[in-house]
Amino acid sequence: MYHIFERGCDVMMKIAIWGYGNYGRRMFESLTRFCSEEYEIVRVYDTAYQNLKQTEGEVILPIHNPQELPEDYKNDLFEKVFICIFYASQKPKQFLREHGIPELCIGGPEDLFPLSSFEQGEKPFEIGREGYDFYVIKNLYGAMANYESVEMLYLFDNEGRVVKEHRDHFDPEYFEWFKYPFVLWHSKAEKVFLKGRYCILTKKHSNNYWHYTYSNLEVVWLLEKAGFQGKYVVPALEYGSELLRLLDVPPERIITLNVFEHNKIYVFEEIYYVVPVKPFGDDLVYGSPVLLEAVACIKKKLSLDPSLPKRIYVKRIGKRKLLGADEIIAEYGFSTIIPEKYSVREQISLFFNADIVFCVHGANSTNCLYMRKGTVFIEAFSSYWMNRCNLYALATEGVSYLPVSTLETVRDNKDGVLRDFTFPESLLRITIQNAFLIFQAQHGQQ
């Protein structure tokens, strides 16, 4: 058997890849093109092996049934298995553990370094707000994550040191998500040099509207107020650009991630980075004053439209749906809104105009930030997945908040996060009735 590869070691490790979907194909290409001196891929496995047959590109390997993994490992065909099944890797991990097969993990906490340890540039201004650190970093590298084309750039340097702060601040153990596209230190991947000043807003989870809003709106607000004239790199999703345009950032200063290519390294002349200093305390983590200043700026651009409904039900159509509630909610005069049918600005306007919003918890709940003082927001939770994402901002903004769950005790949350759920009819009705009472009391209605 071969020894584990370490930096500076010239011994290759024979590995197998499990998973040959889009993510697996990109990782296979990265490892065979740029890491051939560190890792030798000798086997590829996928449950769809009968349809896939073999790999594509310069290196051709047959694709095998994952059930063959234990026997192949016993026969010393490979040393470790690299799982390339994103968002569905727990069962494969368990399978490997049960059969005593080591898993290959590319990247870990030892690769993360604070921004203060990178090459510092000259600051043309200061942020001037307590609770934030501000950096200008020179010659920082960026590489697209292979698992999600619209979401993330890794930020690192030529020594393979990854920026510790480049993460979603609500998911601090983010190194577990890192699946480096290639060996980062002294990589052989093609380098593309980008002159000028950049702010990178494509962090982990930036493909989620709530996470993007809460992690990045305050950053843009602070930089714009300080006089930043550089460009922003945003997710290739509508809200990535639209929220910045609502903060008066012109389109020519917004770059969507889809203009970048996989398996290339982008060398940024200067990156401007604003980091919230944690802990703020829960109330500020989930709704800092700076975030709410940015929201207030957006709300000033909105207007009341009498043609829009005053009661809206924001319905989920993917996973974690609220089942069997549509007709009951409609009885109380709610108009059903499916967010996917509206632009970001249209969604924001619907929330701004509504007196009462009934929303199933999810990223679409983010738009409660744009509700008016004295309105009511009902948020429906499955007992498998509850949090305070919107509590503190709503309390500060003067929006009455009615969180409601299925009122069930859940003892095992492993597989329940994405489940659909139901409410007892009596609970659904009393929640809506309470919302009416609160709104009427606030506005002097009988």
Language-model segments: residues:
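Short, polar loop motifs at secondary-structure junctions
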Residues: 45-52, 87-88, 237-239, 362-363
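Phosphate-bearing ligand-interacting subdomains
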Residues: 49-114
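The feature primarily captures lumenal catalytic ectodomains
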Residues: 110-446
